[in-house]
Amino acid sequence: MAHYHNDYKKNDEVEFVRTGYGKDMVKVLHIQRDGKYHSIKEVATSVQLTLSSKKDYVYGDNSDIIPTDTIKNTVHVLAKFKGIKSIETFAMNICEHFLSSFNHVIRAQVYVEEVPWKRFEKNGVKHVHAFIHNPTGTHFCEVEQMRSGPPVIHSGIKDLKVLKTTQSGFEGFIKDQFTTLPEVKDRCFATKVYCKWRYHQGRDVDFEATWDTVRDIVLEKFAGPYDKGEYSPSVQKTLYDIQVHSLSRVPEMEDMEISLPNIHYFNIDMSKMGLINKEEVLLPLDNPYGRITGTAKRKLASKL
């Protein structure tokens, strides 16, 4: 029989805003074998549950708690029986399981991050079972579902590091007594893209294809045409262009959040060595760095 501390008393002057508990970074490699042709999904999954009762917090009564070890095991078993077609579908399966299996679970939130494996390919021929780690952006998702509602689905890209050596500048900004930054018409532009978007509720979505489309848009608007590039007057303008094109080309998308750090590369002064360095040798600086953020959504249609 479970024992808890009866001498604990509820404080009527304090109330919870939100509670949750779960298991983080549950790692799984799922292999789908179709004859000799194998497909893989490696993921790290974090699950948070909110219960209808707060007695575990207030009184130390654990009788409603689903152990976090059970949550870990559930992720493993669902991967076996449901597979992982997409990380978004897998996250929805986990939410649905806990909400349907336990009446006292009122909220499930699942974060899944996919390891970027890519199938070996040469001269258009794909290998049947060999993969290479290819970190050109990490695919992640967040799914939250309340007992009384549909799942709210976000997908995203992170750790997509890009750089261009020209077609970027920064001019016309405010200058005061503390400004030392010179205006520049031509500079390196490097960033590590983080973007997250929310889907319309209740729509059937090809999550994998949509993610590929958004990543292509990010690369396209950052780099521009392959033969000449595209000028960026600011990180803000590039961020906005990505959002506008994504919302235009992906009808399933409701809104989009982007964060772009401005990773600096500065020309190294070689004048003391009698050398002129014309932006050929640059010094990468990890910090400090600027960071530009923005969230854009579709405007509601006018009823007039």
UniProtKB/Swiss-Prot annotation:
N6-succinyllysine PTM positions: 10, 23, 221, 228
GO cellular component, one term: peroxisome
Residues with PTM Phosphotyrosine: 289
Catalytic function, reaction form: urate + O2 + H2O = 5-hydroxyisourate + H2O2
Superkingdom of origin: Eukaryota
Cell compartment(s), UniProt: Peroxisome
Active-site feature positions: 23, 68, 264
A biological process term (GO) from this entry: urate catabolic process
Phosphoserine PTM positions: 39, 63, 232
Metabolic or biological pathway, per its Swiss-Prot or TrEMBL entry: Purine metabolism; urate degradation; (S)-allantoin from urate: step 1/3
Gene Ontology molecular function: any one: urate oxidase activity
Matches recorded under Pfam families: Uricase (PF01014)
Motif (Microbody targeting signal): 302-304
SUPFAM superfamilies, per database record: Tetrahydrobiopterin biosynthesis enzymes-like
Enzyme Commission number(s) of this protein: 1.7.3.3
Family label: Belongs to the uricase family.
Name of the featured protein: Uricase
Species per Swiss-Prot/TrEMBL record: Canis lupus familiaris
Designated gene of the protein: UOX
